Amino acid sequence: MLLAAALALALIPSVTEPLTTPARADTSAQPKVTRSADALTVSAPATEKTPGYIIDIATGELAITTERAGEAVLSTAGGETGGLRFRSGGQWQHATEVTDWAWKDGVLALTADTTLDGATVKARLTPTSDRYQLDWDVEGGSPDRLGLAYDLSSAGHWYGHGEAETPQGGPGVDQPWPLDTGEVEHGTFGPASYNMIDPFWYTSTATGLRVDTGDVMDVALNKGKDGLGAFTVESPDTYKATVFVESTPLEVYRDYIGIVGKPAKSDATYEQYAKPLWNSWAQFYTKVDQEKLLDYATDLHDNGLDGHTIQLDDKWESNYGNLTWDPTTFPDPKGMSKKIHDMGFDFGLWVTLWINLDSDNYQHAVDNGYLLMDAKDTSKPCEVTWWNGQAGIIDLANPDARAWYEGNLKKLMSDYDIDGLKFDTRFFDEKCAPREGHQATDYQKLGTQLADEFDLQGAGIRVHWNETAHEAGFVTRQVDKGTGWDSLRASATQNLAICTIGYPFVESDMIGGSGGQPAPSKNVLVRWAQSASLMPLMYASTSPVDTNDTTTGQKVDYDQETVDLYRQAIETHKKLAPYIWDQVQSTLKTGDPIMRPLFFDFPKDKESYTVTDEWMLGPAVLAAPKLSTGATRTVHLPPGTWYDVNHGTVIHGPKNLKGYAAPLGVTPAFVDLKAKGAAKAIKALKRHDVPAASVLISPDAPSTGSGTPFEVTTEATNWSTRAIRNVQAALDLPDGWTATATGPTTAKSLKAGGTLTTTWTVTPAADARWGGHDLTGTVTYDRAQKVSDTVRAEVKAAPGSVTAPYLTTATTDDARYAQGGDQFAIWAGGQDLSGWKDEKGVIYLDDAAGEKATVQAQLVSQDSTSPFGKAGIALANDLTAPGKGGYAVLVMTEQYGLEFMTDSDGNGALDTWAGGGSTYHPAYLKLTRDGTAYTAYASKDSETWSRVGTADVPSAAGTGDAGMVASAANVSYPGENIEAVFGGFSITS
């Protein structure tokens, strides 16, 4: 009955309502200007389709505030920052008092003094019904860059931008959503960037900003938590911006698309939308050969892991730019291609426009003028550094160069039965000079035109910033991601950012990540596949059968459940393909993104503006995959009538589904029964094998001390349409812990939608170790069914002291310490622990490390506000001396993985570095010393060790100190501390 009703309701079309219904007005009304004692007011009247707005221009200190319906919706920055800013002589200046103005032919011209003597701002503001143009420049003062600055809070939340560079590791492991909830520091934001970016931002108050420039920008949003948005163009030329003022964010997006253009086609085929692309990169990185690739394809084929293409990524060439096979690793490429085709896959290759200086083709390209020339000396080729060495770049503006390169590609494809290509490249570099008659921005267009000649096999191409890129309809793949939960979450919000700047055919980075980090865990890999199954396309690499850990060189085997659940995600996506293909056709008509934030469809739903782990896939499907640990989640449903595809129930929104069941085999998804395509979506997504109940344990991160009681709550919920019986709640605890229930732990039955809530007083063992401990809430029902949820309870240390023979020392005033058996804790501030500063807290053993020594410890956990916070182990001749000699540290940073740093000249400053990768805990750290040779190792399990780096430390002499160190590295976060917990510290000498 419920399904029949749902399908009937699906025939009713949905309507998107604006935030503010525009008043009806005379369509012939024109903007006008009025003046008061301290302001100019520009009024743009409402029309049948636009809400109207007011621009209030403060004249005492030039500031621009945009208002709609009597409320401010966007305001420039004030105070010392200034809204209209420019840099001159290395110092920032801004516009001040308006000294003159004129309103003529629909343009408001302003003249303003500035904080720099002899410099004047000239601004022109041109209002129309749904936007205004703001152009301005500086006369006098010799500026070298101009910028707009806004008070972020004046416009609510901010979105757009594309792939954002952030101090927290973006775009690889971080993508704040909304942007103002994080920090964006994007200093090379320009048309030649490898990142998928466009100079467009929009807000929850339905305003938007587009900067019209072909120059590099410096963009900062909430840098250092300053609450400002600074959009700086690194040029003295006229600053050109469009400010959109609409009723909803979707209408702002549509106005923007009206300028830059919508896709004229989709470069991906139906099959490429329906099935994954399997690319070799994250499976092998550069350690790939013919045998490995064929084994990979065979495993996928034999395990029913469907896909349309096997794509061979980097390291097949004899040298970069040769476009010839490495005969050692690929002795029979044509035979390999045939075997891949025989398994039912297409075959593709990775290519680039970089030609390395030592390649066979480089000199030929130089001799024939095929390469971009150097910007500083146009008589010589431009040499650039990329991730595989030093290279030149083919000049696509040279018809002969393009013909030569394209001819080589097509011959390669013909000779070896290659069906398509993955272009992984930049088409221009800021170090190079555009060909005469061209600009830097033209190279994005030229790259687009080149790529459009080939089947891109669902890998698309990373072009942006111009109308050609928007109109080409390429699939957009993300920048390389890490392999942890943070990267999975970033892959979702990054797609929302990319698709809402005008690139609608999005896919995440390779499922499981591809950033050269340890192999993804089973849970991350499965959850990523589930998430991707509810996106327009699936882009895969890491095999759920087995893969290789690039950090250790070890093989990683996944279990059968991993294979089964990954296959299930592929099948779900294939079933959903007819619905997705319908959305592709709709996008070609409207330009609207397929994957989009909830508030595009539900602009009146305030909660939708901050949801980070849900999205709409077309108008009917709300995707809410689980993107973190645990087996439950809270799902936000906007207003409407929603069909739960997992349980067959109908739910009326708005509603928050707390503790929604999401065990590893379940992907939460809901269908808007009044939306177009609802029936097709239900047919694809409806399941009959999902557990009826869930259990939620909260809080999700309880904290306590050894032997100190705390409370948790378990809440069992029946999500099905029938009653469940014989319900029993329980709590599984670590050894030595106890729990007492207050309230019922059993129920004879729970009706549909019913809950059983139990509060538990949990007491850790008196000697419970510091760090995380699993607490698992379980519920059994209907005698044989069981569901569970797990949280990590943190047992915290309390500052105290350490016992002999351990000593402490600090180069920061706020260091504190504790010891509990073989565990240690350090609380410390400190601006940095490298180079210019050496501020830290230390627990150490004096004169314990000989000339041949191994120092080892487990870093249990670390917690700091600063993403640069550091904790680990150290060696030195004397850890208490400023000029230590023999000084080396191996630390884990809060966000940026491992750092092995040494002092090369004995002055006490750490000045050499190795490391990187992802941050993980617990981390096993090891430093070995052999005379002046130091080597650093790290491990996740204390069994398989990876070498981080080796360094010579000439000042190492005699027996030295060794210990555990921590520094908040808080130079950008003044006053913040780090808390680090260690165990298993040892020295063998």
Report each predicted region and the residues it spans.
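Extracellular glycan-recognition regions
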Residues: A29, E794-S989
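Catalytic and substrate-binding clefts that recognize carbohydrates or anionic sugar/phosphate headgroups
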Residues: Q30-P31, R35-Y270, T298-D299, A661-L673, ...
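Short glycine/proline/serine/threonine-rich loop/turn segments at secondary-structure transition edges
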Residues: A766-L775
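Short acidic/proline- and small/hydrophobic-mixed sequence motifs that coincide with surface turns
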Residues: A631-R633, R722-N726, G772
